[in-house]
Amino acid sequence: MLVLDSGAISRLSERSQAAVAMILALRDEGLWPPLVPSVVLVECLEGHGGRDAAENRFLKTCDIAESVTEALARRAAFLRRRARRGSAVDALVVASAEPGGTVLTSDPRDLAALAAHAVRVRVEQI
């Protein structure tokens, strides 16, 4: 399973040659569509249709996890406590990738710290 954070969404929604090539490679590997926890939208959108157009177009190709269960929230809280860093959204992204998933991000520092306490979660920089 592939989970995207806000940085990955911003980069992949650019429609650059590199972004298109990465999406095609992920599709070929069976990792598309990715999962995007709905709370990530708070970080990658501005709430303005015009400025959010590229991201909104891109998000139509993703699976949006629209709810955060109590179990997922508690797992994210545990990861955040163990890592001693990262935002609540970052912790939910990593918890959503458990077990055995990959998180794609533009800034791996906090996510890697959280993933160090998760069950077989890899963090890859875009």
Language-model region placement:
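Phosphate- and divalent-cation-binding pockets in alpha/beta enzyme and binding domains
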Residues: 43-44, 75, 113-114
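Short beta-strand scaffold positions
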Residues: 36, 67, 88, 105-106
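Alpha-helix capping/helix-boundary segments
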Residues: 8-9, 40, 72, 92-93, ...
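Short, well-structured N-terminal submotif of metal-dependent ribonuclease cores
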Residues: 1-36, 45-63, 118, 124-126
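Acidic, metal-associated active-site segment
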Residues: 44, 87-102
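Short, flexible loop segments at the rims of nucleotide/cofactor-binding pockets, characterized by
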Residues: 11-14, 42-43, 80-84
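Acidic catalytic patch
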Residues: 61-82, 108
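Acidic, PIN/NYN-like endoribonuclease modules and their adjacent C-terminal/linker elements
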Residues: 98-126
